[in-house]
């Protein structure tokens, strides 16, 4: 199991899509932040307010990236990058997890 050490974690979860997507904010001493999330099966659309790197930590997602018409599969250990102020879609058939790093 990969660990993130010496951080502060928000007690309250970020809940989206009627509880089908949940994440926790993790704060580092240098001021940076990541979110660790769990996504139940479904299809969801998200928007970014800043650049992000999404790493799949468990399971897999199909992702429709901005300005694309083709869904791409990202499995455990893979990642994709998003610019600020864009929308993207993800879908999955089984529970999946992610770690989002903000740029």
Swiss-Prot record:
An example Gene Ontology CC term for this record: cytosol
GO function terms (MF aspect): guanosine phosphorylase activity; purine-nucleoside phosphorylase activity; thymidine phosphorylase activity; uridine phosphorylase activity
EC number: 2.4.2.1, 2.4.2.2
Record's keyword terms, sorted: Glycosyltransferase, Transferase
Keyword Transmembrane helix recorded: no
Reactions listed under catalytic activity: a purine D-ribonucleoside + phosphate = a purine nucleobase + alpha-D-ribose 1-phosphate; adenosine + phosphate = alpha-D-ribose 1-phosphate + adenine; cytidine + phosphate = cytosine + alpha-D-ribose 1-phosphate; guanosine + phosphate = alpha-D-ribose 1-phosphate + guanine
Gene3D superfamilies in the record: Jelly Rolls
Domain of life (superkingdom): Bacteria
Signal peptide segment: none
One Pfam match: Ppnp
PANTHER family given in the database record: PYRIMIDINE/PURINE NUCLEOSIDE PHOSPHORYLASE, PYRIMIDINE_PURINE NUCLEOSIDE PHOSPHORYLASE
Function description: Catalyzes the phosphorolysis of diverse nucleosides, yielding D-ribose 1-phosphate and the respective free bases. Can use uridine, adenosine, guanosine, cytidine, thymidine, inosine and xanthosine as substrates. Also catalyzes the reverse reactions.
Family stated for the protein in its record: Belongs to the nucleoside phosphorylase PpnP family.
Protein name: Pyrimidine/purine nucleoside phosphorylase
Organism: Shewanella sp. (strain ANA-3)
